[in-house]
Amino acid sequence: MKNDLQITHVSINLSMYALMQYLFLFDEDTIENHTHFFFGPGLNKEVCKNFRNATYFPNTSKLSPLRRLTLKLGLRITKNWKYPFLKTAKIYAQDQEYPSILIGRRDYSLLSDGPNCITIHMNDGSTIMALQRATNNTLKGKVVSLIYGDILLNYYGNNKYCKEFFMTEVNSSPILEGKIVHVNPLQELWNNSSTDKQRYILSKYNLYDEDMDTLRSKPIAYMSQPDVDNRLLSTEEQYNLVAAILKNYDSSQIIIKTHPRDTFDYRKYFPGITVFDKPVNMELLALAGIKFSKFITICSTSVFGIPYDTEIDWYGAEINSKLLAHYGEFNPNRPYTKMHLK
């Protein structure tokens, strides 16, 4: 790790999307020599290895409640000793989950969790907004806020410490009032980057020519979601749901493009379909020139940034009661075809 005096920026990333955004926003010197990265389990370890100044937080969801509590308290107590630069460095972060304890009560700038994430999650009627309001009024919520600060409960920038939002498109939400909002469309970020910078970003994601050839081999892409990893569906439920969707298409024309956090074994369950499971978000592939004639998805927000001349078959979270309870009902803010299971 670099001398702490050289660390002027902190980037807390829970998704490949937010990491991509940070890489566009800063130059290579800042990224390589003056940023310490904290990666959550949503980041692939092989990608994380490409960053010299980095700390990786493993998935804690399968640990006992006591073990998770011990880890949280340990991080709360030791963070400024282990990472003294947290006291002074500018913080750019996704503020959900366990790593948000690193922010504490410091000001920070929010990175995007994905396209339109604030519009989707931080408006009246959204599952997350309702959960935050309910939790804040409980004794447990008040204790958590006292120990860790408000951010652990009021994430997605819904707190007084989040001063800036870095978005890739215009979002709408009452929590944006009074905040500094930067809107940097991905295509503009890509176009404004030099060829060397574009190659640099692709190299961080371990993308090579043979990967591009695989992706270009099929005209239709199924965009997966990490619903088993998020413990929303069982393996059997995931298989049955995806099988019911894919039977509507010619399997020889499809490639399954997995979500970066999706570890479901599509090769095992769908042996006749090409699978691309490198942990790369579709938005970056689109910027690099990968184009499909059609995308199929349940409710992946990855399709929000896809060019309008690409067809979207959108099934929606309402095709499964567990997914609907988690995601809520929403639709793309672009042309799409609403699909139904037969």
Predicted regions and their residues:
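Conserved donor-binding/catalytic core segment of Leloir-type glycosyltransferases
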Residues: T214-N230
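Short, flexible/disordered intra-domain loops and linkers
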Residues: L63-T78, D229-E237, H326-E329
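Catalytic donor nucleotide-activated moiety binding site of glycosyltransferases and closely related
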Residues: Y249-K278
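Short His-Asn-centered micro-motif
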Residues: V10-S15, F38-P41, I101-R105, M122-N123, ...
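Active-site and donor-binding regions of nucleotide-sugar-utilizing enzymes
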Residues: I7-G157, V303-F304
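A donor-sugar binding/catalytic signature common to diverse glycosyltransferases
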Residues: L110, M282-Y327
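A nucleotide-sugar donor-handling region in carbohydrate enzymes
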Residues: N136-K218
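Active-site regions of enzymes building and remodeling cell-envelope glycoconjugates
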Residues: E32-H36, V47-L63, P115-I120, A134-V143, ...
